[in-house]
A protein has these predicted regions:
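ABC transporter nucleotide-binding domain
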Residues: 211-301
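Conserved small/polar residues in nucleotide/adenosyl-binding loops
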Residues: 303-305
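Short coil/turn motifs at beta-sheet boundaries
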Residues: 6, 51, 174, 259-261, ...
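N-terminal acidic, proline/glycine-rich, low-complexity intrinsically disordered segments
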Residues: 1-4
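ABC transporter nucleotide-binding domains
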Residues: 8-13, 18-25, 31, 39-244, ...
Length: 305
């Protein structure tokens, strides 16, 4: 990443890696493969912990005031990435800064600027819509009067005013997701993480939620969302990162990805990101300016050769 790309960015991530320990057989290290430990899993090494590698050398920036989407299948590392960015867990290595604050050195400062909505609604079904929002407002430090006033604003903003006194248990799936996102905005964050926000919604509810998400971006908020749906990334995102096998394998605007990956593509993987950058510079020097770099991978649409 260049200094120019990082300047004014909401998020800067460099060489992020994350793995989890997994149960091994009688405490013996595995022989290798996807679950092998960093030492390669030498045979017979007693007491070694097998590890599942979830993220490997992930780097990217998120411009302030944009919607950036991470697209990938289940298990691609999307939720782990969001959990690291939102300070819920720490990475094994790499650097993460949010609005110039390091997530390890100043997690409290980072949390003051962000909000997160997970895959499953965090609302209390035994409370009404209004009671849920007032409750979350109080949790975020608002006094009773301010929490009530903010709840009224959010109910109107997310088209829930007519259901304000209805128990959340009676809400439809789309209404619950809107209420869940509204609860994240009781104190307006600079950055909102949305982890698969439309999972399980019908097409009409999904389109409605997309409209609310776009409005938040238009109001100046930065949003990072994960999704399994290509059409959702295309509909919402200013920039898309494709996560596969623990790495970002493609990045660009939706239009760029359609253009560059809508035909046969040559992909070359390197041991280091520096090697990939050097190779891409050589290609661009040969007038192949469509060479794209994503971490340690260089991609070139063959239609441009």
């Amino acid at each position: 990443m260049t200094d120019q790309a990082e300047r004014g960015a909401a998020i800067v991530v460099r060489d992020l890696t994350k793995s989890y320990p997994i149960a091994g057989k009688a405490g013996t290290a595995p022989e290798g493969g996807a679950g092998a430990p960093p030492d390669g899993g030498r045979k017979g090494k007693r007491g070694a912990r097998m590890r599942k590698h979830v993220l490997d050398g992930v780097s990217f920036t998120v411009p302030a005031g944009s919607i950036v989407s991470f697209l990938g299948h289940n298990g691609a590392g999307k939720t782990t990435l969001i959990r690291i960015l939102s300070t819920l867990i720490t990475a094994d290595s790499g650097e993460v800064s949010i609005f110039s604050r390091d997530v390890k050195e100043d997690p409290a400062g980072v949390r003051a600027d962000i909000a997160t909505t997970g895959q499953f609604a965090a609302i209390d079904e035994n409370l009404t819509g209004r009671e849920n929002l007032e409750f979350f407002g109080r949790l975020r430090g608002l006094d009773r009067a301010d929490a009530a006033a903010r709840a009224t604003e959010l109910l109107a903003q997310f088209s829930l005013a007519d259901s304000a006194s209805t128990l959340a248990s009676a809400y439809s799936g789309g209404m619950r997701r809107r209420l869940d996102i509204a609860a994240s905005l009781c104190v307006v964050p600079r950055l909102l993480f949305l982890d698969e926000p439309t999972t399980g919604l019908d097409p009409v509810s999904r389109e409605e939620l997309w409209g609310f998400i776009r409005q938040l971006r238009d109001d100046g908020m930065t949003l990072v969302l994960t999704t399994q749906y290509l059409e959702e990334a295309e509909a919402l995102a200013d920039h898309v990162h494709l996560l596969k096998d623990r790495r970002i394998v493609a990045s660009g605007t939706p239009e760029e990805l359609r253009r560059d990956f809508g035909s046969h593509v040559l992909r070359v993987s390197f041991a280091t990101a520096a090697g990939a950058e050097a190779f891409a510079r050589c290609l661009r020097g040969a007038c192949l300016d469509r060479a794209r770099v994503a971490g340690k991978m260089v991609s070139l649409s063959l239609i441009h050769i």
